[in-house]
């Protein structure tokens, strides 16, 4: 069944969200949400569940490298794996949940902590590496989200959403393959708290220690891989800055950069 569409997003600033987190003593890294031109040191994180091994362990390290190459962000090269109960969870605006199989639900206490993380400004990027839509991982993800965010059902992210222009201007959600032609999300307080792709995004990013891509990208080859990297960059920038690209000043920045920076889309 094709998911319903999210309502068109309305403008919300990142600062009120971070202020609420800081006031609650939850967010330990002020200054992450900054406009283009400033540097922010970030560390990418993956949510670690006991029965869900990382199917693409080199992907986040490669993404960290690409973030430094493509943006003004300064990224810690080594990602971190975090259990749902870890207090470090609240130091990371964006956390990845990836898998290629079904998994068990976390404990009630861990579910409550994830709910708090997503409610107070955190973003969960979910990436299926199953190679098809609607598999065991997908079923487990939907069950998890139903417990973490009861009443909020994943819905299709509309083409007009600011996520598609948070850094690069994009029109699709590529990965190692194209299992699902749409992106899903869950909104909280008019922002995407969950971003869900079934196209094995991390499979397109993974690169071994010898500099070789670990997986072929089909059907679009290296152009599709490049689009996957651009989408991953957009997700990171969205999680850090939310919808600042709706401001005309940033639209102007994109257009100037496209004219002056080789290889920019």
Predicted ranges, named:
Residues 3-25:
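N-terminal secretory signal peptides and thylakoid transit peptides that target proteins
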Residues 29-94, 101, 201-202, 209, ...:
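Aromatic-Pro/Gly-enriched surface loop or interdomain linker
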Residues 47-50, 97-100, 127-130, 158-159, ...:
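Active-site-proximal beta-strand/loop segments in catalytic clefts of secreted hydrolases
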Residues 57-64, 111, 115, 138, ...:
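Extracytoplasmic/secreted envelope proteins and their assembly/folding machinery
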Residues 79-84, 107-113, 179-181:
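Alpha-helical scaffolding within the catalytic cores
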Residues 91-99, 166-173:
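Charged, often glycine-rich, active-site loop that binds/positions anionic groups
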Residues 94-138:
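Short alpha-beta junction capping motif
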Residues 131-229, 233, 258-262:
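An acidic, glycine-rich "communication" segment
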